[in-house]
Amino acid sequence: MNKWTKSAMLSVLAVVILLTTTSCSTSNTAGSTRNVVATGKYALYTKPRTVKGAKLVASKSMMKKFASYTQSDADYYYGRLRNLAYKGSAYYFHVYGYKVTHTGSIYYHVVTMNGNYRGYVYGGKKVGSFAGGVKKATTTQPTTIPADFMNYVGIAIPGTVWNYPPYTQYKTKRLGKVNWTIPSLAKFKVTKAVKRTREQDTYFYLKSQKSSVPSGWVNFRYVLHYSEIEGNEGIIHN
């Protein structure tokens, strides 16, 4: 074996070692424990950054934008009921897998809550202990149900019922909309209340009193005493 052949073999071996990863799944842990927020210290790639062919998905500056949510951002949302671009709960990340490189580096496979950005980000050296490019996120905070909402309630038009408070969990979806797929006189009970950490708005979990009507989360702005809904045969909320 001449020195050129030997050198080529060593180069190939080095590349193979560099690209070696162990794929693992985190799907056996509760979804809420796998919600994270970017730190802005590392970019997002299509593969672990050290793997050949890894392409940039979101730069460090973009990840930093996802990471930041100030009181000014919350005030903007409060006045307009929408977030600035790349802001809000939709830009938390959900971890659904990871890869370990030969050096012991963890790269988490993540996706934004709205599904728009997906890829791998460096996450430290210990599986499940989020570091590097991500840190653990608490997307909602528990809050109390107001005393005057202990009786039956209804939803003003065009209130929407969600499976989660919007984008506080991955795969958020609409379950129905009042006066479209949900009757305007549908009756509910409030059983839980949370506040979204970023937007600071409150969502009530409404338990449907009829099997044909879905239970789910509704923005408090659209939840009214049932007597108000019933007396007006449904209320339109502008």
Region locations from a protein language model:
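Homeobox/homeodomain signature
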Residues: 8-9, 14, 32-35, 46, ...
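Generic "edge-of-domain/loop-turn" microfeature
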Residues: 14, 49-51, 100, 115-117, ...
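Beta-loop motif signature
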Residues: 26-102, 130-203, 231-238
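Sec-dependent N-terminal signal peptides of Gram-positive bacterial secreted proteins and lipoproteins
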Residues: 1-27
